Amino acid sequence: MTKRYVTSSLFVAALAAVLATPVAAQSSYTFTRIADTGSFPGGIKGPVALNDDGLVAFVGVRDGGVTGVFVGRGGPVTTVADTSGTFTFFGFPGINGLGQATFFANKGNHLGGYYAGLDGATTIVENRGAVAFFGGDVSSSPSGSFSTVKMIPRLPREAQVIVAGDGGRVIRIADTSGSFGVLDLDPHVNASGRVVFHAKRRDFSEGIFVGRGGALDTIADTSGAFVSFNDSPAINDDGDVLFEASVIDSNGEVIDGLFLGRRGEIRTVLDSTGAFAGFGLAPALNARGEIAFQGTTKSLTTESLTGIFTGGDPVADRVIATDDPLDGSTVSGFDEVSFRSSLNNAGQIAFLVRLADGRTAVYRADPRRHRDR
């Protein structure tokens, strides 16, 4: 296993385009409604996924209880697969740079797996042969063809395996046959097939690791100032890694933060000594070096604010937050997984939100620079 040097300075089936209509605006973004519970009365499940073309994938329940994976960009949505056909259950979706929605699904008769494209035409991996079942959900590169998943094989010494693939040969990234004891439920992959994940070793240390099949690089681990890490780190197409961790500061206090690993060094992006008390479950990082996360501000003199942010200033870096106007209503709340790594290389952000008028809806936030190009 190759370990990078880490500094002590602290500081992740192409569809036809239809015209998208913005429904509301903040100072830096306009918002395009992808779907709401008017069309999906049985509910829409978070999180949602976004690719570089602005296509958003989500799981929703139509009239009659038909559940499916759907894709839209603002206008009519396309059904990728639903329970009126082969599949009986769907997990959280992804969407790759080819426009193919990727998803976990059960087919009945104890058969299930990860699939891509219309009606799951491409099988990423199924629970046949050596594969017993799966853990976590699929993550796909928004700019490439690769997807990564965690699976549970039948071999006792390999209780967990992370693999990546694009519908062809599946590549083993990491497993628990050696020093690792627990692997990330939600690894992430970039356009070149490099996978980032959090893992705990059998000696109770833990860290953030990157691999593409073969030797792994250690981005950060608990041999230094870091004391713990969260699952779901992000990786961009340059191989930079954004992760959430806890660290001991110079005063011996434990603080939480978002940290960036780039070219063997680590710097602090944001931490809990600032305006935010929490940074959500799955921060995002794009090729421009922009970040996005679902955060909650500290409640010192005002009520805490939950929303999606792109930096440390809750006002200047706010994309959308509770009590903001949106689509003829106001934002009443976010689920824990309203946002999960759904930032693309154009700076667009997809998310699920609850509105004061009773709707639950999926939106894409479009930065004004993107719309003006």
Specify the residue positions occupied by each region the protein language model found.
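Bacterial N-terminal signal peptides
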Residues: 9-22
